[in-house]
């Protein structure tokens, strides 16, 4: 953890904060003096809250379904009621559910992928904008993915491509309101076993093979030949969220060890 205090007195919403990258972001924001609103639909977010409070940090949690606009609005309302403002929004919800060729996806599965990996970011941006416009200040960091190209996850890739487009367009539209919008395109990242599984279990041998192809592609086409760590992703996200990146907006920063897709 950094000894810096980049988020002192700043109110920071972190979505998807019960585990993985989101948990790492929430812990470090709190360690750097931030007031954290942790949004997740898993009860495991309460364990992260306990970790923060045990080290003297300031945080609250909200269980919310961010695949709905009502869920996103509830998170912003909680932040305003508890802290009075929102300085930073970090959109971290998402993740591929199935890994298989596009023609193997059903209509229902495609909709679920888009609901998981595009709409939470879209809804949270929409929900927080009125507050940031009123403040004439704010920072949004969207967690995207290197996987906007590659095999066996096209609905997820399309969703993250949408996140990248949203990032660029919001930055252009709201620079005049003092709002910066950037994204980190994460590559393959090593993480502890997930308490709440993100991917559907591969049932057939074909599904196992398709998933393995994605894993192999990630390592084989990465210059550095390895997965990143959660801390390496957290470092990039919080750089963009902090005043250190005050002259950056509309950027999508790849953090994937040179991943070429």
Predicted ranges, named:
Residues 2-4, 96-99, 226, 237-238, ...:
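Short C-terminal tail/terminal secondary-structure segment
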Residues 5-37:
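Canonical Rossmann dinucleotide-binding motif of NAD(H)/NADP(H)-dependent dehydrogenases/reductases
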Residues 63-75, 107, 231-232:
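The beta1-alpha1 cofactor-binding region of Rossmann-like NAD(H)/NADP(H)-dependent oxidoreductases
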Residues 100-102, 106-114, 204, 214, ...:
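Substrate-binding pocket helix/loop in short-chain dehydrogenase/reductase
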Residues 103-122, 137, 141, 163, ...:
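Catalytic Tyr-X3-Lys loop
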Residues 125, 159:
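Active-site helix of classical SDR
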Residues 130, 172-176, 246:
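Alpha-helical segment proximal to the catalytic Tyr-Lys
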Residues 176, 188-221:
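A glycine/serine/threonine-rich, flexible loop-to-helix segment
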